[in-house]
Amino acid sequence: MKTLLRPAVSLFVLLTAVTGVVYPLAVTGIAKVTFPEAADGSLIVKDGKTVGSSLIGQNFSDPKYFWGRPSATSPMPYNASSSSGSNQGPLNPALVDAVKVRIEALKAADPDNKLPIPADLVNASASGLDPHISPEAAAYQVTRVAGQRHLLPADVKALVSQHTEGRQWGVFGEPRVNVLQLNIALDSVSK
């Protein structure tokens, strides 16, 4: 029995040290050298204070800000520790009701807006934490944000254009706008 126990415990301790200490430290060290900003969570710092991450959406509900995609995390929106999709199918009555409520909220916030509401403003992303919206979703909100901030819509459109990211490596994905970065830029312009 002792002849089996000693190698088993030794192997357990060795593998725990390698997989629990050495490997994570090595990967973190390599990441900090090769991708220093991303290794720390792509944090956005404004005036010496961390205001969020460029990788995780935030809940903006004030009409003077651009709003991101709805969050699928519960019970608290945009909770990174409970990232998941809603898993509701397109015919699920709960999803249909949620989308109707979101459409009404968008219409109530900007009743004069007659543009079609982009799908990403009423549907959550697969992770429930997407920090981006489409340029169309940003364009839909320009008049509301400009009016709330007493800015010219053309100036707000220009800001949206400046913060529109292209396809990943020019090939993958679609153009997108990071909502947090756009709202930070808006705050800088509005001061």
UniProtKB/Swiss-Prot annotation:
GO terms for molecular function: ATP binding; P-type potassium transmembrane transporter activity. Keywords: ATP-binding, Cell inner membrane, Cell membrane, Ion transport, Membrane, Nucleotide-binding, Potassium, Potassium transport, Transmembrane, Transmembrane helix, Transport. It is found in: Cell inner membrane. It is a single-pass membrane protein. The chain crosses the membrane at residues 11-31. GO terms for cellular component: plasma membrane. Pfam families: KdpC (PF02669). The system is composed of three essential subunits: KdpA, KdpB and KdpC. Belongs to the KdpC family. Part of the high-affinity ATP-driven potassium transport (or Kdp) system, which catalyzes the hydrolysis of ATP coupled with the electrogenic transport of potassium into the cytoplasm. This subunit acts as a catalytic chaperone that increases the ATP-binding affinity of the ATP-hydrolyzing subunit KdpB by the formation of a transient KdpB/KdpC/ATP ternary complex. This is Potassium-transporting ATPase KdpC subunit. The lineage of its organism: Bacteria, Pseudomonadati, Pseudomonadota, Betaproteobacteria, Rhodocyclales.
